[in-house]
């Protein structure tokens, strides 16, 4: 509100303040009467003007003041509208009737400072009170949380106690349930024992009455008495279901018939025995209806209860042993089956690898093939650039060619690691592959060529060489001479190029000889092993002697080193040629050397690529014999030349 009152001062109030100031009124009166204003001894004179102008000046000032008042009124109205829109209240004009003196101003300023200080103190007190309230609230919240935690802990303890009590009750119930059947079983067993004892005693009495007749001899009396004593001490325990009544009746009837036929005097005794047997039968039916009975279908003199018990024990032991043996037998069979499955899987994998012997080893990687084809494309572009005399494109294409060759030779090192391996060499031997010692795709200088004088001496000394070799050498010399004439080489350039050519050829020949010797030694080792009757399989290599293994590994490593050194030699020659010749001359050399090499003995790469794609494109995996045939065809130089000529004619 204070800020709004300060800027919403009406023009009437401003004009009243000006009128109250006597100094301003005096200046205005002077200006109206004399046309001059005195302000701190600064005189303003208007003597050169006419009297008419003096009269017109106050009217202009009044008009300006009126215009100023109108503008201020418009601004005032706009401010009132803004105020009403902001605060939604009508504007009240401030009252300036009271004149403020300097003393009042000096008194008001410290009052304002005190008010500000009081306000700050009030604000500080309010902030402190708020902080205290917040602290109290935090303390109350912490106390409530602690109380809640204590209540939760008490509830958890109560729950645990209840669970423990429930578990104890359950255990007691289980124990009672387990004890009840055991008690019942014990009672039943005791009752059974009592009944069996009673039955045994009664049966013994009946047997004695039955067998101890007047006609029985003394020995039988003694045997039966001894048996009865043994029977009393060692009571039988059998699980065989028997019927004592029927057996006893049958025995008694047989004995009675015999006694009636032999002696008529024994009738009374037999009748007594029958009566006793009938009484026993009735009592036994009542007491032993639920008990298993003893089988006495044969002579009691032959019974031996010890043998019966031993037989049962033997049966239980034999059954246990049989079950254990059965489990062991099943485990052995399962282990054998697992071993057989593992062996079958291994054999399947080995068969698959044998079917793909040549593909994985001799198949060149797609990256290397793509790089070689790109080099050929670059050479074709160089031919066009030479025809068009475009030096910029020549420089760019030569740069691309050098970069691609460096990448290509780095990939060939990886392929060398694949081939120079005893297992891979063994597989190639099984497949019947004969590798060519020279696998160079592009030879810049065309083989064995020294200076012209050395070539003439060699031709004179070696008269036994074939005519084809002479023709090849003449062709090599002729294309190189033609290149010198076409490129317009200087004497220095031709001399440097000849020296570099001689050095390259000598190094290349030495490396070729060493590689051929190492190849022959490796083949001798494998051929000697094959002729000795030793199976050439990957497993058989593990059974070699350590000396042979070391020899083979050393020779293979040397062969690898020689191949890599030949690759480095080619790279060095490329870099040295670029330093001797200009870009146009270098491009022309690459084009001529490429044409000469493609017409000559170097293998054609499209043929290789087509062969490998034909092998891989088959739906079924190719057999071992198909791969061997293809590799032999590739190794035969005659067939390769025929295919090259055929493609070249196309």
UniProtKB/Swiss-Prot annotation:
Keyword tags: Coiled coil, DNA-binding, Nucleus, Transcription, Transcription regulation
Residue ranges, compositional bias (Polar residues): 242-251
GO MF terms, alphabetically ordered: DNA-binding transcription factor activity; sequence-specific DNA binding
Region (Basic motif): 307-327
Region named Disordered: 109-130, 242-279, 452-473
CDD domains in the cross-refs: bZIP
Stored InterPro entries: bZIP_sf
Composition bias, Low complexity: 252-278, 452-466
Keyword Transcription tagged: yes
Keyword Cell cycle found: no
Location in the cell: Nucleus
Recorded GO CC terms: nucleus
Cited function: Probable transcriptional regulator.
Name of the protein this chain belongs to: Probable basic-leucine zipper transcription factor K
């Amino acid at each position: 509100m204070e800020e709004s009152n300060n800027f919403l001062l009406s023009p009437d109030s401003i004009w009243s303040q000006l009128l109250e100031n006597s100094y301003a009124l005096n200046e205005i009166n002077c200006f109206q009467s004399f046309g001059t204003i005195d302000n701190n001894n600064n005189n303003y004179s208007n003597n050169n003007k006419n009297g008419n102008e003096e009269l017109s000046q106050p009217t202009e000032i009044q008009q300006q003041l009126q215009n100023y008042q109108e503008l201020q009124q418009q601004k005032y109205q706009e401010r009132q509208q803004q105020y009403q829109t902001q605060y939604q209240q009508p504007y009240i004009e401030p009252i300036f009737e009271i004149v403020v003196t300097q003393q009042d101003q000096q008194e008001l300023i410290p009052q304002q400072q005190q008010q500000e200080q009081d306000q700050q103190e009030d604000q500080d007190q309010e902030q402190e009170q708020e902080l205290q309230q917040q602290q109290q609230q935090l303390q109350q919240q912490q106390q409530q949380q602690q109380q809640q935690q204590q209540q939760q802990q008490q509830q958890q303890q109560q729950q645990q106690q209840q669970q423990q009590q429930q578990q104890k009750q359950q255990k007691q119930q289980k124990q009672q349930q387990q004890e009840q059947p055991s008690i019942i079983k014990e009672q039943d067993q005791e009752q059974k024992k009592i009944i069996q004892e009673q039955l045994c005693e009664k049966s013994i009495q009946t047997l004695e009455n039955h067998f101890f007749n007047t006609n029985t001899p003394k020995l039988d009396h003694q045997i039966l008495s001894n048996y009865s004593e043994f029977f009393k001490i060692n009571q039988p325990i059998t699980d065989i279901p028997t019927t004592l009544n029927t057996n006893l009746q049958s025995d008694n009837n047989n004995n009675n018939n015999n006694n009636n036929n032999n002696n008529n005097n024994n009738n009374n005794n037999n009748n007594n025995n029958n009566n006793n047997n009938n009484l026993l039968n009735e009592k036994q039916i009542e007491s032993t209806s639920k008990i298993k009975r003893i089988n006495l279908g044969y002579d009691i003199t032959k019974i031996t209860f010890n043998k019966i018990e031993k037989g049962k024990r033997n049966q239980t032991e034999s059954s246990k042993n049989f079950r254990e043996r059965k489990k062991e037998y099943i485990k052995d069979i399962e282990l054998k089956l697992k071993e057989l499955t593992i062996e079958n899987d291994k054999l399947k994998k080995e068969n698959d690898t044998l079917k793909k012997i040549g593909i994985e080893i001799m198949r060149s990687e797609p990256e290397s093939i793509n790089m070689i084809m790109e080099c050929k494309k670059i050479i074709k572009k160089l031919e066009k650039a030479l025809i068009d005399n475009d030096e910029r494109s020549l420089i760019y294409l030569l740069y691309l060619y050098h970069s691609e060759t460096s990448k290509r030779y780095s990939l060939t090192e990886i392929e060398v690691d694949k081939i120079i391996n005893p297992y891979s060499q063994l597989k190639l031997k099984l497949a019947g592959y004969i590798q060519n010692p020279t696998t160079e795709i592009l030879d810049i200088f065309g083989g064995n060529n020294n200076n012209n004088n050395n070539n003439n001496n060699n031709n004179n000394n070696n008269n036994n060489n074939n005519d084809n070799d002479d023709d090849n050498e003449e062709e090599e010399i002729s294309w190189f001479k033609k290149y010198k004439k076409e490129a317009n080489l200087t004497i220095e350039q031709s001399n440097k190029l000849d020296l570099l050519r001689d050095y390259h050829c000598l190094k290349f020949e030495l490396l070729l000889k060493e590689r051929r010797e190492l190849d022959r030694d490796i083949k001798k080792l494998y051929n000697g092993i094959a002729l000795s009757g030793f199976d050439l399989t990957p497993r058989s290599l593990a059974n070699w002697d350590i000396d042979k293994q070391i020899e083979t590994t050393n020779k293979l490593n040397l062969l690898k080193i020689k191949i890599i050194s030949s690759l480095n030699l080619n790279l060095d020659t490329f870099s040295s040629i670029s330093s001797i010749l200009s870009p146009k001359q270098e491009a022309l050399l690459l084009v001529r050397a490429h044409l000469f090499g493609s017409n000559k003995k170097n293998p054609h790469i499209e043929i290789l690529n087509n062969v490998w794609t034909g092998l891989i494109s088959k739906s079924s995996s190719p057999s071992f014999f198909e791969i061997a045939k293809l590799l032999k065809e590739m190794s035969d130089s005659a067939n390769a030349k025929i295919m090259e000529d055929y493609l070249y004619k196309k």
